[in-house]
């Protein structure tokens, strides 16, 4: 009986409690599984509301505004898994994580518009400077896509004036006539583990799925003032997948004299892109590494200058540079695996296209060279070219492996330099290209060292209209024409190369070229070891030429004379004892078969000073007026023979005579 009375007394309280729960839970029950929740750092719910699947923006924006109020510190906004239409852009807030795991948001704007944006004047009434619009924000998971029939040419995500932003594991799908995501004026912004897939009605000229853009108000980033020249810094794109697109990630447009700094594009996968996977324009301190690029039109493009075409370049309105012309890129493109082929957007595929130059047209006048860029450890398979560089200065291209898989008729080059000087091309492997290595158009003073070129379909190494090029310690085998071919080029040094089984000559000089060769090993060529055509000048020292079908070498002048290298001589030195010196030193040397003359040089002092020519003799003895007592006379001697512009010279013989006081 007492229990019954207790139950009757408490019944109204129980009923009130359950009624309260029913009322509070009614909205959630009406939209079961379709809600947005804001929790603070302690996990306490600060906002919860239903989201209409046909118009999710009002509820989502209210949640984001709750965070933006700043009343609850750093928050997490969670959306219940499901598919939602966004008829208006939602403005992101600082100090939050937006968790979209299992969520699909569809861009259903009636006109131009995005799904998510950083704060801007249109939505908040404020102008933002620097990186002040959005800070400490993470977007996690989810899929951003377009509603059926939405072809308005808008991005899915647009960020500007932002700092410490991460987009992690989000899929961006099915863009038409725009970019999937766009970023300008960002600092420490990261896209990681994201998917970019599906793109139509765009062209190679303007179609990066993820565009790292400039903050320019008229053509590239409208509606995000202030336009204060803030550039991107420390942008990271890592472990993302780009597939079935026009282009992948990067930048085409530039402010003259301002630079995107510290961009890292690492460990991404690019496949089936019609255009370029990675586009870098005005990048400094950039790292492009460990990406896998498959079945794309072009792998990596790196621009420091573009006079015309697809790049927009902006100045201060009077044609002046906004900042200053950078002289040091300080960037590297390393350890990428690249496979390129002809596509609808790229009829001349290349693994890499590196471009600087002297500005004309819309760029303020000056030289915008690609200076101090390292390209190393890349593997390139191509139906077109490998690496093409224009106006590269003091760059290193090393340890790259380039293989051509296209038709034999294609005129392709493994590493091609235009107007580029002072670069090191080292330890690259080029296989089955028209030319393996080529310097042309005033590409002066480059060093081509320790490369391997095999199965070239023309000359393996070409030097055209370029002076002072050094080709040293390379291995060249089984090419269709020449191992090393020079045309209208001066003062080349071709040293210690191994050249085997070329279809024509091991080394060929043409059209007034001049070169010094030394210690090359040339064998098995179907014509000559070395061919020096009319009007050229060649000095050859210690080359070893064997088994070449038509002979060791030929000087193609009026007599078309064959020449052979000549062997070493031996110069006898010694010591003149105290009191025996009479002001003269008698020198003698061993005669060399085939030598027509001997040239003697002397340096006064054992370690310093220049060697100066003393005499040219046909005999094997000479009496020299030597230095004063207490000095050392250091001598060098070479044997020579000359034939139609070819000077065959023996290795240097050395001797030192110590004159006692």
PLM feature spans:
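Short glycine/acidic-rich loop motifs that flank beta-strands on beta-rich extracellular proteins
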Residues: 85-89, 107-113, 147-155, 176-183, ...
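N-terminal extracellular ligand-recognition/capping segment immediately after the signal peptide
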Residues: 72-114, 120-122, 144, 172
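Right-handed parallel beta-helix
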Residues: 127-272, 277
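Pro/Thr/Ser/Gly-rich low-complexity, intrinsically disordered linker/stalk tracts
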Residues: 564-594, 629, 646-661
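Beta-strand-rich modules
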Residues: 624-645
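Acidic Gly/Asp/Thr-rich repetitive segments characteristic of extracellular carbohydrate-active
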Residues: 42-80
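Short, T/G/N/S-enriched strand-turn elements that build extracellular solenoid repeat scaffolds
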Residues: 60-69, 85-94, 108, 127-129, ...
């Amino acid at each position: 009986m007492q229990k019954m009375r207790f139950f009757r007394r408490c019944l109204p309280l129980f009923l009130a409690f359950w009624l309260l729960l029913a009322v509070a839970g009614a909205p959630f029950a009406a939209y079961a599984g379709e809600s947005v929740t804001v929790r603070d750092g302690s996990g306490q719910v600060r906002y919860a509301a239903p989201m209409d699947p046909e118009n999710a923006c009002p509820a989502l924006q209210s949640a984001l505004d709750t965070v933006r109020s700043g009343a609850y510190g750093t928050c997490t906004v969670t959306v219940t898994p499901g598919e939602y239409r966004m008829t208006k852009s939602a403005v992101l807030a600082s100090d939050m994580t937006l968790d979209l795991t299992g969520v699909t948001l569809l861009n259903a704007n009636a006109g131009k518009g995005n799904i998510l944006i950083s704060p801007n004047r249109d939505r908040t009434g404020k102008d933002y400077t620097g990186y002040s619009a959005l800070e400490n924000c993470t977007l996690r998971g989810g899929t951003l896509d377009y509603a059926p029939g939405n072809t308005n040419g808008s991005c899915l995500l647009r960020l500007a004036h932002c700092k410490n932003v991460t987009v992690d594991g989000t899929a961006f799908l099915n863009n038409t006539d725009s970019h999937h995501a766009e970023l300008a004026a960002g600092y420490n912004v990261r896209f990681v583990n994201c998917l970019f897939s599906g793109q139509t009605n765009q062209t190679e000229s303007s179609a990066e799925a993820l565009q790292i853009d400039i903050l320019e108000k008229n053509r590239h980033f409208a509606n995000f003032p202030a336009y204060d020249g803030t550039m991107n810094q420390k942008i990271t794109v890592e472990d993302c997948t780009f597939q079935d697109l026009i282009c992948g990630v990067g930048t085409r447009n530039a402010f003259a004299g301002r630079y995107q700094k510290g961009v890292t594009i690492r460990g991404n996968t690019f496949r089936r892109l019609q255009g370029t996977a990675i586009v870098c324009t005005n990048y400094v301190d950039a790292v492009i590494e460990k990406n896998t690029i498959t079945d794309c039109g072009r792998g990596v493009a790196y621009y420091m200058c573009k006079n015309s075409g697809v790049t927009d370049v902006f100045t201060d309105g009077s044609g002046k540079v906004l900042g200053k012309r950078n002289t040091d890129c300080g960037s590297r493109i390393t350890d990428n695996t690249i496979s390129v082929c002809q596509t609808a957007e790229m009829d001349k595929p290349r693994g890499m296209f590196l471009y600087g130059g002297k500005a004309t047209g819309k760029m303020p006048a000056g030289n915008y060279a690609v200076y101090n860029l390292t390209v190393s450890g890349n593997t390139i398979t191509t139906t077109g070219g490998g690496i093409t560089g224009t106006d590269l200065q003091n760059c290193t291209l090393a340890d790259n492996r380039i293989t051509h898989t296209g038709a034999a008729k294609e005129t392709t080059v493994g590493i091609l330099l235009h107007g580029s000087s002072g670069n090191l091309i080292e330890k690259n492997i080029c296989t089955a290209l028209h030319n393996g290595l080529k310097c042309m158009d005033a590409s002066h003073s480059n060093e081509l060292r320790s490369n391997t070129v095999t199965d070239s379909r023309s000359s393996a190494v070409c030097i055209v209209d370029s002076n002072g090029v050094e080709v040293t310690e390379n291995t060249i085998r089984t090419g269709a024409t020449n191992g090393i071919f020079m045309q209208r080029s001066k003062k080349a040094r071709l040293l210690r190369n191994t050249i085997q089984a070329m279809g024509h000559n091991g080394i060929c000089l043409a059209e007034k070229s001049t070169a010094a060769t030394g210690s090359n090993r040339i064998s098995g060529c179907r014509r000559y070891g070395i061919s020096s055509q009319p009007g050229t000048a060649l000095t050859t020292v210690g080359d070893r030429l064997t088994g070449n079908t038509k002979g060791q070498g030929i000087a193609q002048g009026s007599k078309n004379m064959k020449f052979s290298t000549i062997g070493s001589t031996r110069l006898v030195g010694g010591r003149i004892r105290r009191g025996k010196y009479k002001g003269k030193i008698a020198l003698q040397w061993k005669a060399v078969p085939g030598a027509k003359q001997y040239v003697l040089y002397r340096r006064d002092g054992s370690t310093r000073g220049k060697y100066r020519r003393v005499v040219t003799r046909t005999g094997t003895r000479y009496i020299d007026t030597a230095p004063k007592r207490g000095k050392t006379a250091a001598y060098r001697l070479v044997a020579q023979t000359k034939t139609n512009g070819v000077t065959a010279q023996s290795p240097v013989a050395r001797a030192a005579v110590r004159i006692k006081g």
